[in-house]
Amino acid sequence: MKILDALLFPVIFIMFFIHLSIAQTDPELTIMTRLGQVQGTRLPVPDRSHVIAFLGIPFAEPPLGKMRFKPPEPKKPWNDVFDARDYPSACYQYVDTSYPGFSGTEMWNPNRMMSEDCLYLNVWVPATPRPHNLTVMVWIYGGGFYSGSSSLDVYDGRYLAHSEKVVVVSMNYRVSAFGFLALNGSAEAPGNVGLLDQRLALQWVQDNIHFFGGNPKQVTIFGESAGAASVGMHLLSPDSRPKFTRAILQSGVPNGPWRTVSFDEARRRAIKLGRLVGCPDGNDTDLIDCLRSKQPQDLIDQEWLVLPFSGLFRFSFVPVIDGVVFPDTPEAMLNSGNFKDTQILLGVNQNEGSYFLIYGAPGFSKDNESLITREDFLQGVKMSVPHANEIGLEAVILQYTDWMDEDNPIKNREAMDDIVGDHNVVCPLQHFAKMYAQYSILQGQTGTASQGNLGWGNSGSASNSGNSQVSVYLYMFDHRASNLVWPEWMGVIHGYEIEFVFGLPLEKRLNYTLEEEKLSRRMMKYWANFARTGNPNINVDGSIDSRRRWPVFTSTEQKHVGLNTDSLKVHKGLKSQFCALWNRFLPRLLNVTENIDDAERQWKAEFHRWSSYMMHWKNQFDHYSKQERCTNL
């Protein structure tokens, strides 16, 4: 037996070596990029076919040591074949332990070990003969700028790449303090380096995606939540605009209450973090040196304590208005038309607020029906709009209360869902869509540039050309997945359209229904059609299904579609009445009442309460008046 083993060993070794050599020389699996060779792997898809995946390709030097908090540096070339057959480490981030073992939260936690050496990207290529000039779709994950990873199962690009014959790319970027800690004037911690990670990955796509059969002139960036806000920020940032073609924004935009902070607030949070981890007060250089000396988990453990108030849908380290990445605030840039002139597709889910309510709103839990008392509702409103004064809070309460049934615990629960979702997602996104669409009309009418007050030359802003390329497509996703593990009252939750965009219902073992598989195929087609042509209705062969046409959103008609298992339906006005409160009335109200002295503010608040009481009294009196009276006394 030993002699036989001795004879067989060289044969086995040679066969293994031949197999390895074939794998390394297979033109499908080994690609030469500008930086060096990468070796990928074949991944199966449900129809007995496969895609080619290149997982964990480095696009930046590891941001370790002195590079912590600094902008990324492009990856240097390598000599050997880089093994790109498995996902990279996740960037350091907060891990949600609120519901241990519960798949609804665990699916968003990193599924790879965490490391600061995390700036890698993934590429999925359809297994077509010699792919060439394919449309490219680059995914940017969400997670409140404090979490997220490109390796999550829900972001698996194989199904979208295979079904729509597009090249799918996703990247890791730094989050939390590692990506967004900012000290004004400091080159060591300028802020926004997480966005610069994304931009460097987009530059890698421009430089290398043609080696994988992709077209660098046909790149659509898409993302969800903070990932969608990031997409919108690249639409605004002048240096990002040339690096992609179109944009899809799912449940997030760059304007709104949680996406950015001022440099003063960013500095306050950086200093507070230093104190929390034991850094002595001193100058910026000393602070950064001390923060760099700390273990990554030390910073993660303290990050939530830097917030100036307790609120829902608020995050510690987010992009900062720096005058470089952002020449001005997102609101100001939108209002002046200073954004990329291109087509956008964007939308929201039906219940954008429910997910965030279980993380601190009084009375809410995933483990019960969350029937909310009036007292819990009023406390929840304060947490939902932490920047508002008493008058502003009364305005929100007045708008969202059913005064004929104000103590109804189900209606209070639904109102809280609407308040959080409308304030943070729906209404900022509606405003973003309207501003984009409005500038398309203005440029068509004037046919002239207004770049004198913008100064961006040929940077691709919507207001520098009379021939605007802008068109807007808006959706409301309102299908609750049949296998969703969250309670029924949470509805169509923030983030749960992603699995349909990435084609997970095509995987039989995941137990979606046939109707959900069809919905997923439709959504992938809409997304890919838009990426190819700027119009979700135009199929890859140029045909259009006239029976189910998705109309352009305009600032006047405001048409949008409902995405669900039914046939496509067109609606008008995305929560227009409620968004008038958030986008127009409340900002003006807070501005007018900002300088009112305490006595007058208290009087006005009491007056609003009295008005509400009188309205309630009148309703009760009217009800009493309509009752039959006893006539026998």
Curated annotation (Swiss-Prot):
Question: Which positions form S-S bridges?
Answer: C91-C118, C279-C290, C427-C579
| One BP annotation, GO | choline metabolic process
- Which residues of this protein are catalytic? S225 (acyl-ester intermediate), E352 (charge relay system), H494 (charge relay system)
Q: If you read the UniProt record, what top EC class would you report for this enzyme, in one word?
A: hydrolase
What protein name applies here? Acetylcholinesterase
Keywords, A to Z?
Answer: Cell membrane, Disulfide bond, Glycoprotein, Hydrolase, Membrane, Neurotransmitter degradation, Secreted, Serine esterase, Signal, Synapse
Q: What are its GO cellular component terms?
A: extracellular space; plasma membrane; synapse
A GO molecular-function annotation: acetylcholinesterase activity
Under catalytic activity, the entry for this protein gives:
acetylcholine + H2O = choline + acetate + H(+)
Main subcellular localization, coarse class? other
Source species, domain of life: Eukaryota
Q: PROSITE patterns, alphabetically?
A: CARBOXYLESTERASE_B_1, CARBOXYLESTERASE_B_2
Concerning its family, UniProt says:
Belongs to the type-B carboxylesterase/lipase family.
Protein purpose: Terminates signal transduction at the neuromuscular junction by rapid hydrolysis of the acetylcholine released into the synaptic cleft.
**Gene3D superfamilies tied to this protein:** alpha/beta hydrolase
Which InterPro entries does the protein's record reference? AB_hydrolase_fold, AChE-related_enzymes, AChE_tetra, CarbesteraseB, Carboxylesterase_B_AS, Carboxylesterase_B_CS, Cholinesterase
- Which membrane topology term applies here? Peripheral membrane protein
Q: Which residues cross the membrane?
A: none
Q: Fetch the CDD domains from UniProt.
A: Esterase_lipase (cd00312)
Which residues of this chain are annotated as glycosylation sites? N133, N184, N283, N368, N511, N591
| Annotated signal peptide | 1-23
Q: What is its EC number?
A: 3.1.1.7
Pfam families listed in its UniProt record:
AChE_tetra, COesterase
